[in-house]
């Protein structure tokens, strides 16, 4: 579909730009960052939105196998939009194989996430997983995240997205590849220093769990989990059942970052752009095993 778009970086002229972009996130369809991203992208592309009905942070690449999915139109967006009652990976898989199965997208953008997804966080991130799912289907994809939410940081990433769309710098992305873009905590007093191409950090977290006073479900709502005689979990009061204790995950990323990795650049005040691939093969170990096998 060819649409006329205003070139914001020129003197008001118009040009034909047939570009189709699919947007999603893991913070849910009601995220203000999702709306801002859709509005920014609409300046340069024909945009569709398919996002989770509810918050899905930290679900990684999980998807619904036994559970049925449902979807419905979402209102107030400047483009066609739907919510899906599933994970970010569900949204992407469902969008590409069902809602828009006969549609070709030039790019998928996932975000803008509140919280960075640099380094090992990208393994747990629903934001990155949605982009990875798109890459699995051969669609170029970008995950965009903020280390710390602020109007300044959001404005920075939206401008970067618009520049990327205008320049079509994603067009040369290899098949089954995605970009992981993270913006550091920044402000007018401490602006982002620029963008650096980076490797993905392997810095781990010092995770631990603390007992919680109240149990919460994946929506953050209070709930009670009970263990009955046959050891099946229940969520209803029963005097014959034992109430289970609740534990919440705590911890921070260990800050011994390797030089010029995404975590390292963020710590220096730069935005990081890390290319990732769905090919998980360890080349060195593959060669070692082949050599070992041939002996």
Where are the model-predicted features located?
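Hydrophobic/aromatic ligand-binding patch that stacks against planar heteroaromatic rings
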Residues: 130-134
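A cross-family phosphate/adenosyl-ligand binding-site feature
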Residues: 21, 32-98, 103-104
